[in-house]
Protein backbone atom coordinates (compact mmCIF):
# COMPACT_ATOMS: atom_id res chain seq x y z
CA UNK A 1 0.00 0.00 0.00
CA UNK A 2 1.34 3.42 -0.96
CA UNK A 3 0.28 6.91 0.08
CA UNK A 4 0.56 10.10 -1.93
CA UNK A 5 -0.79 13.60 -1.54
CA UNK A 6 -2.08 14.88 -4.87
CA UNK A 7 -3.03 18.35 -6.02
CA UNK A 8 -5.03 18.87 -9.21
CA UNK A 9 -5.06 22.34 -10.76
CA UNK A 10 -7.81 23.04 -13.28
CA UNK A 11 -6.72 26.36 -14.83
CA UNK A 12 -9.75 26.78 -17.13
CA UNK A 13 -7.39 28.50 -19.59
CA UNK A 14 -8.84 29.98 -22.78
CA UNK A 15 -8.11 28.23 -26.09
CA UNK A 16 -7.27 31.36 -28.08
CA UNK A 17 -3.64 32.37 -28.67
CA UNK A 18 -2.56 34.65 -25.85
CA UNK A 19 -0.51 37.84 -26.10
CA UNK A 20 2.88 37.99 -24.37
CA UNK A 21 1.57 39.74 -21.24
CA UNK A 22 -1.24 37.18 -20.93
CA UNK A 23 1.27 34.32 -21.15
CA UNK A 24 3.07 35.80 -18.14
CA UNK A 25 -0.22 35.91 -16.21
CA UNK A 26 -0.81 32.20 -16.90
CA UNK A 27 2.76 31.35 -15.87
CA UNK A 28 2.40 33.31 -12.62
CA UNK A 29 -0.85 31.49 -11.86
CA UNK A 30 0.91 28.14 -12.38
CA UNK A 31 3.83 29.11 -10.12
CA UNK A 32 1.50 30.36 -7.35
CA UNK A 33 -0.49 27.12 -7.41
CA UNK A 34 2.71 25.09 -7.12
CA UNK A 35 4.27 27.28 -4.45
CA UNK A 36 1.23 27.07 -2.18
CA UNK A 37 1.21 23.26 -2.01
CA UNK A 38 3.11 20.54 -0.17
CA UNK A 39 1.56 17.76 -2.30
CA UNK A 40 3.82 15.04 -3.69
CA UNK A 41 2.17 15.22 -7.11
CA UNK A 42 0.98 18.54 -8.55
CA UNK A 43 -0.83 17.99 -11.84
CA UNK A 44 -1.98 20.42 -14.52
CA UNK A 45 -3.84 19.71 -17.76
CA UNK A 46 -2.92 19.26 -21.41
CA UNK A 47 -1.15 22.25 -22.98
CA UNK A 48 -1.37 24.31 -19.79
CA UNK A 49 2.25 25.46 -19.98
CA UNK A 50 1.93 28.75 -21.88
CA UNK A 51 5.28 28.83 -23.71
CA UNK A 52 6.71 26.73 -26.54
CA UNK A 53 9.34 24.42 -25.06
CA UNK A 54 12.48 24.34 -27.19
CA UNK A 55 14.65 22.61 -24.60
CA UNK A 56 13.58 20.54 -21.61
CA UNK A 57 14.16 23.35 -19.11
CA UNK A 58 11.76 24.54 -16.43
CA UNK A 59 14.03 26.47 -14.01
CA UNK A 60 11.26 28.55 -12.42
CA UNK A 61 9.28 25.44 -11.50
CA UNK A 62 12.34 23.52 -10.28
CA UNK A 63 13.40 26.43 -8.08
CA UNK A 64 10.19 26.41 -6.03
CA UNK A 65 9.49 22.69 -5.55
CA UNK A 66 11.03 20.56 -2.82
CA UNK A 67 12.87 17.24 -3.14
CA UNK A 68 9.69 15.20 -2.64
CA UNK A 69 7.55 16.98 -5.22
CA UNK A 70 6.87 16.32 -8.89
CA UNK A 71 4.95 18.67 -11.18
CA UNK A 72 3.15 17.20 -14.18
CA UNK A 73 2.06 19.60 -16.90
CA UNK A 74 1.21 19.49 -20.59
CA UNK A 75 2.80 21.72 -23.22
CA UNK A 76 3.97 21.97 -26.81
CA UNK A 77 7.61 21.18 -27.45
CA UNK A 78 9.70 21.45 -30.58
CA UNK A 79 12.65 19.37 -31.72
CA UNK A 80 15.13 21.78 -33.28
CA UNK A 81 16.93 19.04 -35.19
CA UNK A 82 13.89 17.59 -36.93
CA UNK A 83 11.78 20.79 -36.81
CA UNK A 84 8.95 18.66 -35.39
CA UNK A 85 6.28 19.70 -32.90
CA UNK A 86 4.91 17.45 -30.17
CA UNK A 87 1.95 17.57 -27.79
CA UNK A 88 3.78 16.53 -24.64
CA UNK A 89 3.43 15.70 -20.96
CA UNK A 90 6.30 16.73 -18.68
CA UNK A 91 7.16 15.28 -15.26
CA UNK A 92 9.37 17.80 -13.45
CA UNK A 93 11.19 17.22 -10.19
CA UNK A 94 14.03 19.08 -8.51
CA UNK A 95 16.82 17.54 -10.57
CA UNK A 96 15.29 15.81 -13.58
CA UNK A 97 12.67 16.32 -16.29
CA UNK A 98 10.98 13.44 -18.08
CA UNK A 99 8.62 13.74 -21.02
CA UNK A 100 6.08 11.76 -22.98
CA UNK A 101 5.04 12.81 -26.49
CA UNK A 102 1.48 12.05 -27.53
CA UNK A 103 1.33 9.02 -29.83
CA UNK A 104 -2.29 9.03 -31.05
CA UNK A 105 -3.04 12.35 -32.74
CA UNK A 106 -6.39 13.92 -33.59
CA UNK A 107 -6.93 14.17 -37.38
CA UNK A 108 -7.73 17.72 -38.57
CA UNK A 109 -6.92 18.95 -35.05
CA UNK A 110 -3.29 17.95 -34.56
CA UNK A 111 -2.45 16.87 -38.08
CA UNK A 112 -4.00 17.24 -41.51
CA UNK A 113 -4.42 13.90 -43.33
CA UNK A 114 -3.41 13.97 -47.01
CA UNK A 115 -2.28 17.57 -46.63
CA UNK A 116 -1.67 17.95 -50.39
CA UNK A 117 -5.38 17.35 -51.08
CA UNK A 118 -6.72 19.38 -48.15
CA UNK A 119 -4.43 22.41 -48.37
CA UNK A 120 -7.48 24.69 -48.45
CA UNK A 121 -8.14 23.74 -44.79
CA UNK A 122 -4.72 25.04 -43.68
CA UNK A 123 -6.23 28.35 -42.59
CA UNK A 124 -8.11 26.40 -39.91
CA UNK A 125 -5.71 23.56 -39.13
CA UNK A 126 -2.48 25.55 -39.51
CA UNK A 127 0.50 24.93 -41.79
CA UNK A 128 2.37 22.67 -39.34
CA UNK A 129 1.38 19.18 -38.19
CA UNK A 130 2.18 17.71 -34.80
CA UNK A 131 4.32 14.57 -34.94
CA UNK A 132 3.56 11.21 -33.32
CA UNK A 133 5.60 10.47 -30.22
CA UNK A 134 7.91 7.47 -29.99
CA UNK A 135 8.37 7.27 -26.20
CA UNK A 136 7.48 4.23 -24.13
CA UNK A 137 4.19 4.87 -22.33
CA UNK A 138 5.76 4.79 -18.86
CA UNK A 139 7.23 7.40 -16.51
CA UNK A 140 8.88 6.53 -13.21
CA UNK A 141 9.04 9.03 -10.37
CA UNK A 142 11.93 7.79 -8.25
CA UNK A 143 11.41 4.41 -6.66
CA UNK A 144 8.01 5.30 -5.24
CA UNK A 145 5.67 5.70 -8.20
CA UNK A 146 5.37 4.77 -11.85
CA UNK A 147 2.53 5.91 -14.07
CA UNK A 148 1.12 5.45 -17.56
CA UNK A 149 0.88 8.86 -19.26
CA UNK A 150 -2.21 9.41 -21.42
CA UNK A 151 -2.92 12.63 -23.31
CA UNK A 152 -6.46 13.64 -24.25
CA UNK A 153 -8.52 11.14 -26.23
CA UNK A 154 -5.77 8.49 -26.14
CA UNK A 155 -7.75 7.18 -23.14
CA UNK A 156 -10.31 5.75 -25.61
CA UNK A 157 -7.77 3.38 -27.20
CA UNK A 158 -7.48 0.88 -24.34
CA UNK A 159 -5.64 -1.69 -26.47
CA UNK A 160 -2.82 0.82 -27.06
CA UNK A 161 -2.35 1.90 -23.45
CA UNK A 162 -0.99 -1.15 -21.64
CA UNK A 163 1.78 -3.46 -22.79
CA UNK A 164 4.54 -5.66 -21.39
CA UNK A 165 6.66 -2.58 -20.60
CA UNK A 166 4.13 -0.73 -18.43
CA UNK A 167 1.53 -3.27 -17.22
CA UNK A 168 3.03 -3.14 -13.71
CA UNK A 169 2.69 0.67 -13.41
CA UNK A 170 0.92 2.01 -10.33
CA UNK A 171 -1.57 4.44 -11.85
CA UNK A 172 -2.66 6.19 -15.05
CA UNK A 173 -2.48 9.97 -15.41
CA UNK A 174 -4.70 11.43 -18.13
CA UNK A 175 -4.26 15.11 -18.98
CA UNK A 176 -6.70 16.64 -21.41
CA UNK A 177 -8.33 19.83 -22.66
CA UNK A 178 -12.08 19.57 -23.16
CA UNK A 179 -12.57 23.31 -23.61
CA UNK A 180 -13.52 22.64 -27.25
CA UNK A 181 -16.79 21.03 -26.08
CA UNK A 182 -17.97 24.12 -24.20
CA UNK A 183 -20.79 23.16 -21.83
CA UNK A 184 -22.06 20.25 -23.94
CA UNK A 185 -21.94 16.55 -23.03
CA UNK A 186 -18.42 15.96 -24.36
CA UNK A 187 -16.51 16.47 -21.07
CA UNK A 188 -18.88 14.11 -19.21
CA UNK A 189 -18.64 11.44 -21.92
CA UNK A 190 -14.86 11.74 -21.83
CA UNK A 191 -14.93 11.28 -18.03
CA UNK A 192 -17.16 8.21 -18.35
CA UNK A 193 -14.73 6.56 -20.79
CA UNK A 194 -11.88 7.29 -18.37
CA UNK A 195 -13.79 5.57 -15.57
CA UNK A 196 -14.07 2.44 -17.72
CA UNK A 197 -10.29 2.23 -18.03
CA UNK A 198 -9.88 2.29 -14.23
CA UNK A 199 -11.93 -0.86 -13.65
CA UNK A 200 -10.63 -2.59 -16.80
CA UNK A 201 -7.01 -2.15 -15.77
CA UNK A 202 -7.66 -2.30 -12.00
CA UNK A 203 -5.60 0.87 -11.64
CA UNK A 204 -6.44 4.31 -10.24
CA UNK A 205 -6.63 7.18 -12.73
CA UNK A 206 -5.96 10.84 -12.13
CA UNK A 207 -7.72 12.88 -14.79
CA UNK A 208 -6.91 16.58 -15.13
CA UNK A 209 -8.81 18.61 -17.70
CA UNK A 210 -8.15 22.26 -18.49
CA UNK A 211 -11.80 23.15 -17.93
CA UNK A 212 -13.18 19.98 -16.30
CA UNK A 213 -14.34 17.55 -15.42
CA UNK A 214 -11.15 16.66 -13.52
CA UNK A 215 -11.31 13.67 -11.19
CA UNK A 216 -9.42 11.23 -9.00
CA UNK A 217 -10.76 7.74 -9.72
CA UNK A 218 -9.92 4.58 -7.78
CA UNK A 219 -9.28 1.17 -9.33
CA UNK A 220 -12.98 0.24 -9.01
CA UNK A 221 -14.09 3.31 -11.01
CA UNK A 222 -15.29 5.18 -7.91
CA UNK A 223 -14.78 8.94 -8.16
CA UNK A 224 -13.00 10.07 -4.98
CA UNK A 225 -12.85 13.77 -5.85
CA UNK A 226 -13.92 15.84 -8.84
CA UNK A 227 -14.22 19.39 -10.14
CA UNK A 228 -17.05 21.37 -11.67
CA UNK A 229 -17.10 22.22 -15.36
CA UNK A 230 -15.69 25.54 -16.64
CA UNK A 231 -14.27 26.67 -13.28
CA UNK A 232 -10.81 27.40 -11.94
CA UNK A 233 -10.33 24.79 -9.23
CA UNK A 234 -7.62 23.36 -7.01
CA UNK A 235 -8.26 19.96 -5.45
CA UNK A 236 -6.00 18.33 -2.87
CA UNK A 237 -6.50 14.68 -1.98
CA UNK A 238 -4.59 12.16 0.11
CA UNK A 239 -4.41 9.11 -2.06
CA UNK A 240 -3.89 5.52 -0.90
CA UNK A 241 -3.53 2.73 -3.41
CA UNK A 242 -2.44 -0.86 -3.70
CA UNK A 243 -0.62 -2.17 -6.77
CA UNK A 244 -2.83 -4.69 -8.56
CA UNK A 245 -3.40 -5.84 -12.11
CA UNK A 246 -6.68 -7.14 -13.46
CA UNK A 247 -7.26 -10.28 -15.51
CA UNK A 248 -8.11 -7.90 -18.34
CA UNK A 249 -4.54 -6.57 -18.34
CA UNK A 250 -2.96 -10.00 -18.50
CA UNK A 251 -5.45 -11.75 -20.76
CA UNK A 252 -7.35 -9.03 -22.62
CA UNK A 253 -6.95 -10.61 -26.06
CA UNK A 254 -7.74 -14.09 -24.77
CA UNK A 255 -10.88 -12.78 -23.05
CA UNK A 256 -12.04 -10.97 -26.19
CA UNK A 257 -11.51 -14.15 -28.23
CA UNK A 258 -13.44 -16.18 -25.67
CA UNK A 259 -16.37 -13.74 -25.68
CA UNK A 260 -16.37 -13.68 -29.49
CA UNK A 261 -16.43 -17.49 -29.68
CA UNK A 262 -19.23 -17.58 -27.11
CA UNK A 263 -21.50 -15.36 -29.20
CA UNK A 264 -20.60 -17.16 -32.43
CA UNK A 265 -21.56 -20.47 -30.79
CA UNK A 266 -24.91 -19.07 -29.64
CA UNK A 267 -25.59 -17.65 -33.11
CA UNK A 268 -24.99 -20.96 -34.90
CA UNK A 269 -26.84 -22.93 -32.22
CA UNK A 270 -29.95 -20.78 -32.75
CA UNK A 271 -29.74 -21.19 -36.52
CA UNK A 272 -29.48 -24.95 -36.15
CA UNK A 273 -32.48 -25.02 -33.78
CA UNK A 274 -34.59 -23.00 -36.24
CA UNK A 275 -33.82 -25.49 -39.00
Language model segments and positions:
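Short beta-strand scaffold segments in enzyme catalytic cores
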Residues: 87-91, 137-139, 213-217, 235-237
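Juxtamembrane/start-of-transmembrane alpha-helix segments at the extracytoplasmic/lumenal side
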Residues: 240-260
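Short Pro/Gly-enriched beta-strand edge/turn motifs at strand-loop
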Residues: 70-75, 117-123
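Soluble catalytic regions of membrane-associated enzymes that act on cell-envelope
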Residues: 1-108, 138-145, 149, 153-155
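Catalytic beta-strand/loop cores that center a nucleophilic Ser/Cys/Thr
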Residues: 125-141
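Alpha-helical transmembrane segments
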Residues: 259-274
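A short, polar/charged loop-to-alpha-helix boundary motif
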Residues: 106-118, 230-245
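CN hydrolase (nitrilase-like) catalytic-core segments centered on the catalytic cysteine
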Residues: 41-73, 126, 144-234
Amino acid sequence: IKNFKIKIIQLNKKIKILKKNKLKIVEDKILRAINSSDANLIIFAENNYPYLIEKLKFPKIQNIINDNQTVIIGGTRTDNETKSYYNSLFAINKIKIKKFDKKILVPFGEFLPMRNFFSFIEQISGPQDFSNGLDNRLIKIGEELSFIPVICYEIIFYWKLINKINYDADILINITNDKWFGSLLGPYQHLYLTKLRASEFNKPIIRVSNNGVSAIIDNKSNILAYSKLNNYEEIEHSFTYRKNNSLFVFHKFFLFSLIFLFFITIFFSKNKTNE
